[in-house]
Design a protein with these regions (language model features):
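Conserved catalytic core of the tyrosine transesterase superfamily
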Residues: 1-198
Length: 198
């Protein structure tokens, strides 16, 4: 079994596809999507309430734990659609009107950590991920994906709510793409300096 501690973007997509057609598919898909895209810890995810969302403006308020910085993130179009789909289905669940928590169980109570863990673990198994999947891997997947896309370390730090940049550096340190073009850029500078000397 691999020691990798994060999921790739493709693995997360496979997990979302694996859950989307089950009896709780709308909820599970939305849960995995938001956890991944916003790099949420499981407690932050399960503490989300409808008052934290503004679907019209496309924003989500992330209340970070562990003394992290809380932030407002943009909600992308597919995230809004996933929340809307889940909200429509959720309204038909027994006891759904008793709580404002976004993610609830079939009994209408807020989803527990154990239930969320099981959903994510089972989605990983169903998707055939190369490593045993748990909720925090979605947070790491977010950080690594942002680094892979060229996001600055400080921006990733803010996005994930890290107080200490040491926790963020792991994502950018292993990203070889950050060195792409380094020699070409330096060559251009050297060429410019040579032309100015002449």
């Amino acid at each position: 079994m691999s020691k990798r501690r994060y999921l790739t973007g493709k693995e997360v997509q496979a997990m979302m596809q694996a859950v989307c057609y089950g009896a709780t598919g709308a909820r599970d898909y939305c849960l995995i999507l938001l956890a991944y895209r916003h790099g949420m810890r499981i407690s932050e995810l399960l503490d989300l309430h409808y008052q934290d969302l503004d679907l019209n403006e496309g924003r989500i308020n992330i209340r970070r734990l562990k003394n992290g910085f809380s932030t407002v993130h943009p909600l992308r179009f597919d995230e809004r659609k996933a929340v809307e789909r889940w909200t429509l289905e959720r309204a038909n669940w027994k006891g759904a009107d008793r709580t404002d928590a976004i993610f609830i169980s079939r009994r209408g109570s807020r989803l527990s950590r154990q239930q969320a863990y099981r959903i994510i673990r089972d989605a990983g198994i169903e998707a055939g991920t190369v490593t045993q999947t748990h909720p925090h891997m979605l947070r790491h997947a977010c950080g690594y994906e942002l680094a892979e896309r060229g996001a600055d370390t400080r921006l990733i730090q803010d996005y994930l709510g890290h107080r200490n940049i040491r926790h963020t550096v792991r994502y950018t340190a292993s990203n070889a793409a950050r060195f792409a073009g380094l020699w070409e850029r330096n060559n251009l500078i050297n060429e410019k300096l040579k032309r100015e000397e002449v």
